[in-house]
């Protein structure tokens, strides 16, 4: 009887090893968020402002984010210093716009801008994962959700095989749209950002047609990296 039990136990261990070997390795997702020191990324940006008069103003410019250096915070954790530059046209010189920081911890990625910290990504990455992006600031609960994990994403004529989309807000009705989302690519970082806050025409002749009365749109797209 002991021999049978031993053999059966060995079979179970062998079977479990085979099953585990076929499972994909866990992916913490750290390589999606500011993965390289010294890396710089150029973005094309479009800001659109809609007025009640029916007119709209479109501004286009470029931003460049440079992962400059790291330092230790008061808790001894490594923090990344990022410099952001701006230019109105491609022929213009880059001018420093702002400086902010980012930090990757065991279970999350943090970004601090204008002294406000946000939880941008949670690790390990997982489809449908939700968290409060404002947990480290005083702005109140802001539910983020992770979608389209490791899926292809296309923007600005470029394809990224492994990306993850973070939905920060997606409230849509017949009379308005409030949407915020960011997309990160493995080995690169942020490749797309969308912030839309518009109100639609709600009179009888245009209700439900998606005609914008007023509001703003901010679209940021990956252009190139170095």
Where are these predicted regions, by residue range?
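Positively charged n-region of N-terminal signal peptides that target proteins for export
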Residues: 1-4, 18
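Conserved functional acidic sites
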Residues: 17-226
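C-terminal motif of bacterial Sec signal peptides marking the signal peptidase cleavage site
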Residues: 13-15
């Amino acid at each position: 009887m002991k021999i049978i039990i031993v053999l059966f136990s060995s079979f179970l261990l062998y079977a479990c090893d085979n099953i585990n070997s076929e499972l994909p390795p866990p992916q913490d997702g750290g390589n999606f968020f500011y993965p390289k020191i010294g890396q710089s990324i150029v973005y094309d940006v479009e800001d659109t402002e809609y007025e009640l008069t029916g007119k709209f103003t479109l501004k286009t410019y470029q931003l460049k984010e440079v992962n400059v250096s790291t330092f230790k915070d008061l808790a001894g954790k490594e923090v990344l210093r990022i410099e952001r530059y701006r230019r109105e046209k491609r022929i213009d010189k880059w001018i420093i716009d702002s400086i902010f920081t980012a930090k990757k911890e065991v279970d999350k990625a943090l970004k601090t801008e204008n002294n406000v910290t946000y939880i941008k990504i949670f690790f390990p990455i997982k489809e449908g994962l939700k968290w409060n992006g404002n947990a480290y600031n005083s702005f109140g609960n802001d539910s983020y959700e992770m979608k389209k994990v490791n899926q292809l994403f296309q923007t600005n004529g470029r394809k990224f095989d492994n990306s993850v989309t973070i939905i920060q807000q997606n409230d849509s009705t017949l009379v308005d749209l409030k949407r915020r989302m960011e997309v990160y690519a493995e080995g690169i970082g942020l490749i797309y950002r969308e912030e839309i806050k518009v109100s639609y025409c709600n009179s009888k002749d245009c209700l439900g047609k998606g005609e914008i009365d007023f509001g703003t749109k901010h679209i940021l797209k990956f252009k190139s990296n170095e």
